[in-house]
Amino acid sequence: MQIVILREEIEIPKNVVVDLKGSIIKIKGPKGEVVKDFSFAKGIQISLDGNKIVLETTFANRRKKAVFYSIVSHIKNMITGVTKGYRYYLKIIYTHFPTSVKVVGNEVQITNLIGEKNTRRAQILEGVKVTVKGEDIVVEGPNLEAVAQTAANIESASKISGFDRRIFSDGIFIYKKEVIE
């Protein structure tokens, strides 16, 4: 069943500045800035009305409705990110060979994972801050997608293949995700 008019209004907090050019939304806040392009969403109009972001579409079928509410969620995540920020925690786990992790430029270098001589590298995306504290890695930033992808890059760079995972539990694993308060 198609819905004739679908409209959603998202409240903009006082300490957030929203800039809209076509389908590109730039949101600035105390924690940083997030830019996202929604040009893929055909038939969905995004506009500013005072201190609200207004999204509208007409004759929304099931697929268009799914895209519409995905965009609403993305914009809400962007506003939360620039006002509070996102943080992921990862744990370095090793049994015999002490794994060392350090941040060099825009990459995380993992050395001595299960005694390997080569260095594994994971890319840090733009706008994301990574810190290593003992056996914990903290990934934080205003863009949820960039923070989550950086944490996933670190986790997948430390993935071990060719070993029984029940015995060789070495690696780096995400154990906590949170919104910074």
Swiss-Prot record:
It holds the Pfam family Ribosomal_L6. GO terms for biological process: cytoplasmic translation. InterPro entries: Ribosomal_uL6-like (IPR000702), Ribosomal_uL6-like_a/b-dom_sf (IPR036789), Ribosomal_uL6_a/b-dom (IPR020040), Ribosomal_uL6_arc (IPR019907), Ribosomal_uL6_CS2 (IPR002359). Keywords: Ribonucleoprotein, Ribosomal protein, RNA-binding, rRNA-binding. One of its GO terms (cellular component) is cytosolic large ribosomal subunit. One of its GO terms (molecular function) is rRNA binding. Transmembrane segments: none annotated. Belongs to the universal ribosomal protein uL6 family. Part of the 50S ribosomal subunit. This protein binds to the 23S rRNA, and is important in its secondary structure. It is located near the subunit interface in the base of the L7/L12 stalk, and near the tRNA binding site of the peptidyltransferase center. PANTHER family: 60S RIBOSOMAL PROTEIN L9, 60S/50S RIBOSOMAL PROTEIN L6/L9. This is Large ribosomal subunit protein uL6.
